[in-house]
Amino acid sequence: MSYPTRAVRAVRLLSLLLCATTLTTACPLPAHALAEHTKSSSAGNNLTTNMDASHASSSSYTSRLALYHSIEALTGVPWYRLAAIDQYERTLTVAHPKDRKHAERIIGIFVTGPVWSGLLNPDAEDQNPRSIELFSGLGQDGSGDGIADRNNDKDLLFSIASYLGKYGNNEDEFGIAVWEYYHNSRSVQRVQQFAKLYQRYGKLDLVSQAFPLPLGSIYSYRSTWGSRRSWGGYRIHEGTDLFAGYGVPVRSTCYGVVEMKGWNPFGGWRIGIRDLNNRYHYYAHLSGFDKTVHNGDIVTPGQTVGWVGSSGYGKPGTQGKFPPHLHYGIYRDNGWTDWSFDPYPLLRQWEQSERKALKSGKTKGTSS
């Protein structure tokens, strides 16, 4: 039996390396791809966290915005797209804090060592830009110090921007770049929604909140999340019922993008709005919608999106199977699915904050 010479073995090894490197370049893994995702109901109950946009300080917003603009100047990638990816990554860390631990910094983007340095790189913590490039890693030196550090804000954001820039700058090309990074259509939708909000308002602190019903109207509510429901099969109640008369305005609780609008057999006429904390706000049993609000539209805190009714529990148009009320639900996206959690504490908080603001002569929404 003959054995290959050292030269032959070296050529074979080099061929395998080049092949694997090509595959890695064609399909970069998402920043969280190496983390194990588990579907636990407790993930959806993570109601408040310091990573939420609503808890960020004004100085943090200023620092982040300045960094986005500086990287835009270097790469040509619009700042609001960088902001959108950064914010989306923050929401993933909220959902998976144990899997996405990183040093405290301005930017919330999380990249694993192997993705940063290259999957075939023997040094998962490599910071040499040349060897990282050799192994098709994501990491680059954005600060000019000759080091590609995945915990350096400039290096991290410059690397993401450089990756995006390879695909082009129009909306479709941006969507393709995000898809190739995450391989998840939900991620593409979320990032594009966030970018749309940031582009519209030109700022990051879009954290104002409003109570879903006018405080001057007659209404009542209590915590009903988790109670049993039987229509259509036994299930738990994923929301809070706010009882009010027919036609009472239903208002957006947040800055967000309309994600869903139409009929649902359970919720009747309903509308769903996605906010920058990656929470889905669900308004159901409406008597109708504001006709100026459409799927994909941006809404603001306190904006009327519909009116209280009693629709649902049947085919389109079914009304009156229960007293008129607003079913308000809230869900958190963990990157793969939405998890319901009890909205009652937030409703109480928004109601009280808005009352205090009205008493002090302020009419705008308040931060949650």
Predicted stretch roles:
Residues G232, V308-H325:
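Active-site loop architecture of trypsin-fold serine endopeptidases
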Residues S2-T5, A10-S70:
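N-terminal export signals and maturation junctions of secreted/periplasmic proteins
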Residues T253-N295, P316-Q319, P323-P324:
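Zn2+-dependent peptidoglycan hydrolase active-site motif and core
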Residues T240-L242, R270-L276, G329:
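Short, acidic/hydrophobic/Gly-rich beta-strand patch recurrent on exposed beta strands
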